[in-house]
């Protein structure tokens, strides 16, 4: 048996041996990884080769087209005949070619072909003032043609501080010479900077690129099949498509660049036909349910004169102007059934109450209870029967009060409404500001002549009789006896004379 010191020594050795093994394994793993620099480098690290030779292919070779010049800057409304007549002032013109858009509109530049190269060179040496056309200075330049197209299908452009080489998909191309040019119609930056951006890709190229992404890395062969980049000048947002667009003085908004459509892949849902079938079936079922509900509503409305009646559900929706709903029927003290209304009660289960739908009590006069003369609205006295009517009726004679549009112990002698206990006439208060006149003033007002200022004479005999005076001083006429009437007529027919 080991002593404690020896056991401690052995444990220390085993622990040190394990640490050495782990350090050796870590050292072997670190040897495969790149060493981390102790300090940051003072010079920038080049991510791509110098000159970007692997990304930007060499420009193709161009040749100068003899006897032909580039002309730009003329109005877009100019025709080929007008352009030919203008240049025939100097030399004979063999051919005129104007560049047009897809809709047939001129882009403001074209090509003029002369008989010889010397004639074309002489025209290029002329000043813009000598070539002025319609008060515009024309821009001239050489016409070039691309010799080799390499394996790159789309065109590209490369700009450096010394020159600009631009290619276009057409048969003609244009270039700005590196040496100072005598033409002052177009000015470009003195020291432009070169920026390389990947060009727009069409639908076929996007599909080809997605297929190439399956390879682990791009080989030089694959790089050759990729589209070449386009070049932008500093401060410009649109690519320089061609030298012709720049020399012609056309604004960027007028130049219509090529449109590339990019179609993103759409995921295909599983069992798409099944989903469409289920959706169509659900839609048809929903439409049929809606039509069935509309038909039921139309049938119920046509069967009754009231708003939105439904005889099959046991309740009716409240009228838009009535904040109550029917909750059932009840029997009053006279043994007659009535509809029971409550304030917005929920619908009851079918069959809980007898399905008896009727209008409120103030609408049942003309439809259900025409025999009762005082059930509902009384047009003679402009009064309502029931809780909304005159409550004094119930206080004066409770037995004759209408309860729920049915009379209780109502006698036949009150059918005409002459009894003050049945229907009371509404009291009319006098109008404010109305002047109360005396009977004499009223009589004077009636006897006035329609002519202003004139006054009719009343017979003096009528005022002398006591009955006439009595009628004058009183508002209501007095019924005379036969004797008084005969005496009054005798006095009027034979007046007394004063001697």
UniProtKB/Swiss-Prot annotation:
SUPFAM superfamilies: RNA-binding domain, RBD. Residues 251-262, 438-447 have a biased composition (Basic and acidic residues). Coiled coil: none annotated. The keyword 4Fe-4S does not apply. It comes from the Eukaryota. Pfam families: RRM_1. Residues 12-28, 195-224, 280-304, 480-499 have a biased composition (Low complexity). Residues 1-29, 195-304, 406-499 are annotated as: Disordered. Residues 214-236 form the DAZ domain. InterPro entries: DAZ_BOULE_RRM, DAZ_dom, Nucleotide-bd_a/b_plait_sf, RBD_domain_sf, RRM_dom. Keywords: Developmental protein, Differentiation, Oogenesis, RNA-binding, Translation regulation. GO terms for cellular component: cytoplasm. Residues 66-144 form the RRM domain. Residues 263-279, 406-425 have a biased composition (Polar residues). Germline specific. More strongly expressed during oogenesis than during spermatogenesis. During the larval stages, it is more abundant at the distal region than the proximal region of the gonad. In young adult hermaphrodites, it is expressed at a very low level in the distal mitotic region of the gonad, and begins to accumulate in the meiotic transition zone. Highly expressed in the proximal pachytene region. Not expressed in mature oocytes. Not expressed in the spermatheca. Weakly or not expressed in the germline of adult males. GO terms for molecular function: mRNA 3'-UTR binding; translation activator activity. GO terms for biological process: 3'-UTR-mediated mRNA stabilization; oogenesis; positive regulation of translational initiation. Belongs to the RRM DAZ family. RNA-binding protein that plays a central role in oogenesis, but not for spermatogenesis. Required for meiotic entry and germline differentiation, at the pachytene stage of meiosis I of female germline regardless of the sex of the soma. May act by regulating translation of specific mRNAs, possibly by binding to their 3'-UTR. This is DAZ protein 1. It comes from Caenorhabditis elegans. The gene is daz-1.
């Amino acid at each position: 048996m080991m002593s404690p010191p020896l056991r401690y020594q052995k444990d220390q050795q085993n622990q040190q041996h394990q640490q050495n093994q782990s350090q050796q394994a870590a050292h072997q793993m670190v040897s495969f990884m790149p060493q981390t620099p102790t300090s940051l480098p003072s010079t920038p690290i080049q991510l791509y080769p110098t000159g970007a030779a692997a990304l930007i292919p060499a420009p193709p070779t161009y040749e100068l087209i003899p006897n032909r010049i580039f002309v730009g800057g003329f109005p877009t409304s100019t025709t080929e005949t007008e352009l030919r007549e203008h240049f025939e002032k100097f030399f004979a013109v063999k051919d005129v070619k104007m560049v047009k858009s897809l809709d047939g509109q001129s882009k403001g530049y074209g090509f003029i072909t002369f008989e010889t190269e010397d004639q074309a060179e002489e025209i290029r040496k002329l000043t813009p003032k000598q070539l002025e056309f319609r008060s515009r200075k024309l821009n001239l330049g050489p016409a070039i043609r691309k010799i080799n197209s390499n394996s790159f299908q789309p065109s590209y452009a490369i700009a450096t501080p010394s020159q600009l080489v631009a290619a276009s998909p057409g048969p003609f191309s244009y270039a700005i010479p590196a040496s100072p040019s005598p033409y002052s119609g177009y000015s470009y930056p003195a020291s432009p900077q070169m920026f390389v951006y990947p060009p727009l890709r069409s639908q076929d190229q996007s599909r080809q690129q997605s297929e190439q992404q399956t390879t682990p890395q791009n080989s030089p062969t694959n790089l050759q099949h990729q589209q070449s980049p386009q070049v932008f000048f500093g401060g410009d947002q649109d690519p320089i498509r061609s030298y012709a667009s720049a020399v012609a003085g056309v604004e960027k908004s007028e130049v219509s660049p090529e449109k590339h459509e990019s179609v993103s892949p759409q995921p295909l849902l599983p069992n798409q036909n099944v989903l469409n079938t289920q959706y169509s079936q659900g839609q048809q079922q929903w439409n049929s349910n809606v039509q069935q509900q509309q038909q039921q509503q139309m049938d119920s409305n046509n069967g009754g004169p009231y708003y939105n009646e439904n005889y099959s559900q046991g309740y009716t929706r409240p009228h838009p102007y009535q904040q109550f709903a029917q909750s059932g029927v009840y029997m009053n003290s006279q043994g007659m059934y009535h509809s029971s209304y409550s304030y917005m009660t929920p619908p009851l289960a079918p069959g809980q109450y007898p399905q008896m739908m009727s209008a409120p009590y103030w609408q049942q006069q003309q439809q259900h209870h025409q025999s009762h003369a005082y059930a509902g609205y009384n047009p003679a006295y402009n009064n309502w029967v029931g809780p909304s009517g005159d409550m004094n009726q119930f206080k004066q004679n409770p037995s004759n009060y209408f309860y729920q549009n049915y009379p209780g112990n109502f006698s036949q002698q009150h059918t005409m409404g002459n009894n003050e206990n049945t229907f009371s006439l509404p009291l009319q208060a006098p109008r404010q500001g109305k002047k109360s006149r005396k009977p004499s003033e009223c009589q004077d007002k009636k006897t006035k002549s329609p002519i202003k200022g004139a006054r009719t004479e009343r017979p003096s005999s009528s005022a002398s009789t006591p009955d006439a005076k009595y009628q004058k001083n009183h508002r209501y006429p007095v019924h005379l006896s036969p004797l008084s009437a005969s005496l009054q007529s005798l006095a009027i027919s034979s007046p007394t004379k004063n001697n």
